[in-house]
């Protein structure tokens, strides 16, 4: 007994131990799960925080525009994203967004503003434009206080230029947007066009089913148990309403079938009244027995006087015309080839019907009765298989009822076919134009640059490149007239390349101002223009300087010298390596300042500074260039003016080795130690003295002759 009790106690203890172990395991599992949750939650919090940070970053990364900063050679140096509504440009490091450290640039020079309400970009100068004219939009000086910017406009401040590219939605007038950025309106139109293309075939199928249903109702007549062919010959003219005159021996089910057919025909008559009036040339005969005294329009009466076959044909024509109108609109948007095949099938059905009608007309002329089976088979062809083949009444073929005259459809079908072929050809052309090879993004950017350059340079030409007349400077002050004379003096000096000609007298020389007279535009290729005007942000020419001098009251000698210097700088900017154009530009500088010194507009010190700098460069170029140009000074020959025509000129070659020879040969021109053009005072004085002596001798001879004549008169 004791053994049994001890065994039971041991079993109870084992059970309790197992329960405790299970409880401990469960608790441990829960703790592990909690620990796992605690380990997972920080990661989740971290990811959620990262997501929030990303969202904030995305909000901060909203870009309104991009500014492409250019180097002097036209390449892109840096791209700056405009993430604010205002972008300040100047020389202050703290307050400006684009830093420009150039002379003439103020701390806050200008700002670019994006107006959110109007959705436009503006350039607002923070300095009065009359004080500082260094701001230029597409090479044109900035005049207004605030001006609207266009996409891909080039803004230059001092010698720094950059191009603005829009990213925010902008309302721009008469400007071309890039093809990869399409407005929302164009996207909506494309979606609507796609929906219409999808809905068009389904709508046409529904129309076709409705018309076929109407045709089946029109051709099926109520079957009678007692019908005699003799009565059919003397029956009144067949109309849609004449079915009421036929004796009714059918059941009520057939009467129910007649009513929807009449309603359907009435609706079809109302729909097709416009088409029947165009095809019918003479009115059909009216029925004597009117139904319930209703007064109907002429178009509905014409439909009643026609055969069921003719009604069917008119309905088919209207269907084809409506389909052609729809397909013409869809072809412009790119119609499918399946619809064109359906139209061809319908046209073939029309031709078959016309052939059957021609056979019937021939049989009528020969007075041969038409069999009912043929008429039934002719009616069954265009209809569905479920329709009943019942012969129509033959009263329309009698002599008493005149046949309705109508325009033959052969001409109509030919014209429609021609129209279809024309439209198909047009569509093929448009498809071929759309399926041309796609332009790369670089070509698109080049086209946009060319268009902006053309537009802006044409404005510059229309404003500053007008023809100059001497009469325009008569009313101006003496200082401006002297400046014009100095600019004209450059053309009197010409150049040629050494070794090109053997005889100096037969030299075909080129004026120094040939390449500076106008800015390059008309006689140059687009690739050259794109390269030139992407490097040269401030184009200047002698003609533009003269136009500004003529029209601008504040445009004086200081502004002329500044633009003239910029014109010569443009040569070195475009031609990076030394060449003959550098040589020509330095010679122009010497000749221009020489003429200004002679007119008294500048001092000797100013001239010497310019001469020394240009002459040093010319000496270097003479050593490095393969073909060294040679100056040719052109002067008016005063001694030969009486014998030769006006404007006769003499060409004199200038060279450092020939100075002594020219002096010994009594040449009217000599050159000092600096190589400048100087006239001989001794020769001029000797000429003047000889002229005075000859005048005095002639006066004495005249006095002697007059005294002798007086003495003879007194004697």
From Swiss-Prot:
Protein origin, superkingdom: Eukaryota
Keywords per UniProt: Bromodomain, Coiled coil
Q: Where is the composition biased (Polar residues)?
A: 366-389, 662-672
Annotated signal peptide:
none
Query: Compositionally biased, Low complexity: which spans?
Result: 20-45, 186-204, 215-227, 234-254, 261-281, 405-414
* Residue ranges annotated for the Bromo domain, each copy included: 474-599
Query: Where is the stretch described as Disordered?
Result: 18-46, 186-425, 653-715
Q: Which cysteines are joined by disulfide bonds?
A: none
Entry's InterPro entries? Bromodomain (IPR001487), Bromodomain-like_sf (IPR036427), FHA_dom (IPR000253), SMAD_FHA_dom_sf (IPR008984)
Biased segments, Acidic residues type: 332-359, 684-715
Regions annotated as coiled coil: 322-368, 437-470
In which residue ranges is the amino acid composition biased (Basic and acidic residues)?
307-316
Put simply, this protein is called Bromodomain-containing protein DDB_G0278469
Q: From which source organism is this entry?
A: Dictyostelium discoideum (Social amoeba)
Identify the taxonomic lineage of the organism of origin. Answer: Eukaryota, Amoebozoa, Evosea, Eumycetozoa, Dictyostelia
């Amino acid at each position: 007994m004791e053994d049994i009790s001890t065994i039971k106690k041991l079993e109870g203890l084992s059970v309790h131990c197992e329960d405790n172990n299970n409880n401990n395991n469960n608790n441990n599992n829960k703790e592990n799960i909690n620990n796992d949750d605690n380990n997972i939650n920080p990661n989740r919090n971290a990811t959620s925080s990262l997501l929030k940070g990303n969202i904030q970053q995305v909000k901060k990364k909203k870009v309104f525009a991009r500014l492409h900063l250019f180097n002097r050679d036209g390449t892109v140096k840096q791209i700056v994203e405009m993430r604010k509504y205002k972008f300040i440009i100047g020389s202050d490091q703290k307050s400006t967004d684009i830093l420009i450290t150039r002379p003439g640039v103020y701390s806050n020079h200008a700002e670019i503003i994006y107006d959110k309400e109007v959705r436009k970009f503006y350039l607002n100068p923070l300095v009065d434009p009359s004080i500082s004219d260094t701001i230029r939009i597409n090479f044109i000086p900035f005049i207004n206080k605030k001006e609207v910017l266009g996409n891909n406009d080039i803004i230059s401040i001092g010698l720094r230029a950059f191009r603005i590219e829009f990213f925010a939605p902008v309302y721009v007038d008469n400007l071309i947007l890039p093809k990869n950025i399409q407005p929302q309106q164009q996207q909506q139109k494309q979606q609507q066009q796609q929906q219409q293309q999808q809905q068009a075939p389904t709508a046409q199928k529904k129309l076709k089913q409705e018309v076929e249903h109407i045709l089946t109702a029109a051709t099926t007549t109520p079957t009678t148990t007692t019908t005699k062919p003799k009565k059919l010959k003397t029956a009144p003219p067949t109309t849609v309403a004449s079915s009421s005159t036929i004796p009714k021996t059918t059941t009520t089910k057939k009467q129910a079938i007649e009513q929807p057919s009449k309603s359907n025909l009435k609706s079809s008559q109302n729909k097709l009244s416009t088409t029947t009036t165009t095809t019918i040339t003479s009115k059909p005969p009216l029925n004597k027995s009117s139904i319930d005294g209703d007064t109907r329009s002429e178009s509905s009466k014409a439909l009643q006087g026609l055969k069921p076959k003719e009604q069917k044909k008119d309905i088919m024509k209207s269907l084809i015309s409506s389909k052609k109108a729809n397909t013409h609109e869809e072809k412009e948007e790119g119609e499918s080839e399946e619809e064109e095949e359906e139209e061809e099938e319908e046209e073939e059905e029309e031709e078959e019907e016309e052939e059957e009608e021609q056979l019937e007309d021939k049989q009528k002329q020969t007075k041969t009765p038409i069999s009912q089976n043929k008429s039934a088979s002719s009616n069954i062809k265009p209809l569905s298989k479920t329709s009943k083949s019942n012969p129509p009444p033959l009263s329309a073929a009698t002599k008493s009822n005149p046949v309705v005259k109508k325009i033959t459809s052969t001409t109509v079908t030919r014209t429609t076919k021609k129209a279809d072929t024309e439209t198909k050809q047009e569509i093929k052309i448009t498809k071929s134009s759309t399926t041309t090879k796609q332009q790369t993004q670089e070509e698109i950017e080049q086209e946009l640059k060319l268009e902006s350059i053309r537009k802006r340079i044409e404005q510059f030409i229309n404003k500053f490149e007008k023809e100059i007349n001497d009469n325009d400077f008569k009313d101006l002050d003496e200082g401006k007239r002297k400046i014009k004379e100095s600019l004209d003096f450059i053309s009197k000096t010409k150049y040629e390349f050494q070794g090109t000609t053997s005889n100096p007298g037969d030299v075909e020389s080129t004026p120094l101002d040939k390449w500076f007279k106008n800015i390059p535009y008309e006689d140059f290729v687009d690739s050259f223009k794109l390269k030139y005007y992407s490097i040269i942000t401030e184009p200047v020419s002698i003609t533009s300087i003269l136009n500004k001098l003529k029209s601008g009251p504040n445009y004086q000698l200081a502004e002329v010298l500044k633009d003239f210097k910029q014109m010569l700088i443009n040569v070195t900017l475009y031609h990076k390596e030394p060449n003959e154009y550098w040589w020509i530009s330095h010679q122009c500088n010497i000749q221009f300042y020489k003429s200004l010194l002679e007119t008294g507009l500048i001092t000797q010190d100013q001239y010497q500074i310019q001469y020394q700098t240009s002459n040093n460069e010319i000496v270097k170029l003479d050593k490095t260039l393969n073909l060294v140009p040679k100056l040719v000074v052109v002067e008016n020959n005063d001694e030969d003016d009486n014998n030769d025509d006006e404007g006769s000129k003499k060409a004199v070659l200038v060279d450092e080795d020939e100075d002594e020879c020219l002096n010994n040969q009594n040449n009217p021109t000599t050159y000092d130690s600096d190589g400048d053009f100087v006239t001989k005072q001794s020769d001029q004085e000797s000429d003047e003295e000889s002229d005075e002596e000859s005048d005095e001798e002639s006066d004495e001879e005249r006095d002697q002759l007059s005294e002798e004549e007086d003495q003879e008169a007194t004697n």
